[in-house]
Amino acid sequence: MPDYIPDAQVVFDPASNSGIQMDTAPYHVNLYRKTGYMLGASTEVPELTYGTAGSMRKYIPNTMTLMQHILGNGVTEVEHFVNWLAYIYQNKRKTMTAWIFTGVPGTGKGLFVHKILKPLFGEQQVPMRSLENIEEQFNLYMRTALFLVVDEFRMGDSGNTGRMADKLKHQVTEPTLTIRAMRTNQIELPSFCNFIFLTNRADAVKIEEGDRRYNVAPRQESKLETEHPDFIAKLADVQAEL
């Protein structure tokens, strides 16, 4: 007779400190995984409030250089984005808004995702997809997403602009999402996902008047290596600052 395999409730709950509990029933498996940075967070850094993000340069100069560049050097936008990230990091909840980074190729948008966002929040919890991937039928990767980064995005590239606009608005703001995996029934689960759109196009998203779902950073027209020629050599310093 084969070994007995107990049933367990499988969830993704970033707000819970419980992980895998298979000692006593009811059995429970939480798919959320804290990163090493979350587990070893320093308590000696002074508390910052909205309006003081610029003082972070004292502690993370290279990270701030990269963020300021991809945000088009907008002072207000940097302040708001840092606050947005901090809220997600501290609360693991949806913000109900998305960010759009626009600029010429080589501004460092991808570097930010791979060198800062993914290490801080977890590789599995920060999937990066193209628009075509979002439109495909199966989206199991969204089950454990704190962020979805949409690369080279332009809404006009969709076969049906209106349908895609409605779909994105729904996903940015709705507290639940429908997960579709191969050979299983679709299920509706709580959504913890926040969206970042990366694009080289200035007309990436059609924003209707009064729509407050999108934060749009000033467009960056200069490559990162042009404005900061020595930055690539400092990538190790960026990760050391986290």
In which residue ranges do the predicted regions lie?
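Conserved AAA+/SF3 P-loop NTPase catalytic/coupling segment centered on the Walker-B
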Residues: 146-172, 204-211
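Conserved nucleotide-binding/hydrolysis micro-motifs of P-loop NTPases
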Residues: 154-155, 200-204, 220-225
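Conserved catalytic/coupling elements of P-loop NTPase cores
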Residues: 154, 175-179, 196-201
